[in-house]
Amino acid sequence: MIIYLPVICLVFAINAGAKLKHDSVANIPEDGRLDFVGLATKYGANTEEHDIVTDDGYVLKLFHLVGDRTRPVLLNHGILQSSDTFILRGNTSLAIQLVKRGYDVWLLNVRGNRYSRRHLYLNPNTDEEFWDYSFVEFAKFDISAAVDYILQATGEKRLSVIGFSEGTTSMYALGILKPEYNDKVKIHVSLAPVCYMYHTRPITLNIVQNIEHINRGLLLLNSNEVLSFYSAAKKLSDVSCIREKVGYDLCLLGIILPVTGGDKREIEEEFSRAAMGHFPAGTSRKNLYHLGQLGLRKFSHFDYGSMQNKAVYGTDTPPKLNLAKVTMKTALIVGRGDRISTVKDVRLLRDALPNVVKYIELQPDSFGHLNFVWGRNTHRLMFPMIFKLLEKYK
């Protein structure tokens, strides 16, 4: 989720349009250079690309790994990520493992990331309005459009959903804001669920507690787009994080794992360099800020401040998002070593949701946030649980 926040200060020093010498490509393993279609093709999946248009005009990329159309599964990525995160482990990745088991796999890219930086009439480079969104808009427009598109394409009435990190947040919001979609979901498997952020670990807690300052800094720089895949910040990431040994020690061991939790043995150096070729994939300042607000208050709509809240919502405070309305079957899977989606917070979520059919705390105790999508042994430790849930609630 908020993986790159510890280095947000670096972004303050970088103009989004700045040119940085980009000489690190040679250090990127092949899987770090391939895009989603390239990776899917390399690992033997029959792949399609679909463009879907939301009701508010965003053009989203939806990838399809062709399988049995009576068994559709939608994968929702986390913040600053893209659909790539579900295929980076190649033959042992979740996307490839699902399609090998016959599932019809669809992968959404929400507005603003590397694949969905398009709109019918707004220019992401010049129109601030393009970036006026958070996970609420992902729910109301992006995921709902993807669900409808997939169901129409397959002829099915329901589908399964697997979300990771913020990909779970937007699914809860969907069930609340568009309750009719609860009936379109067979089961929502929530990996590293993010809804409450009251018990994040020290480094992440400091970030959440200072989200107001981070937001103000980005506002001063007029940075409505954050950590774009095509920005100087991404080039800086490549130069710094993809260098052999130095990049691994600096970025993964020095920044990412202290924030997310996890065991370095699960994200080895060679894979780390490939993964960093796909990350960060971009988001909006507002989305980053809204997620940070989850640690400061209840699960609610975006907080603009009392004056603007009054104009937008008619109240001084933003309306709460009522989790009691999320009636879709939900499985919660949390890692004991996760510093972002903590066991204490996910237990609170379990108690708030009305239809939790399975709650799992993953071992070992070092199982961190990124283990869910990037872990070397996740296909062995967690995937069998997912497959069992999909089969049970088919």
Language model features with spans:
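Short alpha-helix in the alpha/beta-hydrolase fold that links the catalytic acid
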Residues: 328, 342-352
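Alpha/beta-hydrolase active-site loop
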Residues: 128-152
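Cleavable N-terminal signal peptides of Sec/SRP-targeted secreted and luminal proteins
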Residues: 1-18, 123
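Catalytic active-site module of serine/aspartate enzymes centered on a nucleophile-bearing elbow/loop
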Residues: 357-394
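Alpha/beta-hydrolase-fold enzymes
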Residues: 18-19, 152-157, 166-311
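Short beta-strand/loop motif that positions the catalytic acidic residue
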Residues: 326, 332-334, 338
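Short, surface-exposed "cap/lid" segments of acyl-processing enzymes
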Residues: 54, 63-123
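N-terminal cap/lid segment of alpha/beta-hydrolase-fold proteins
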Residues: 34-67
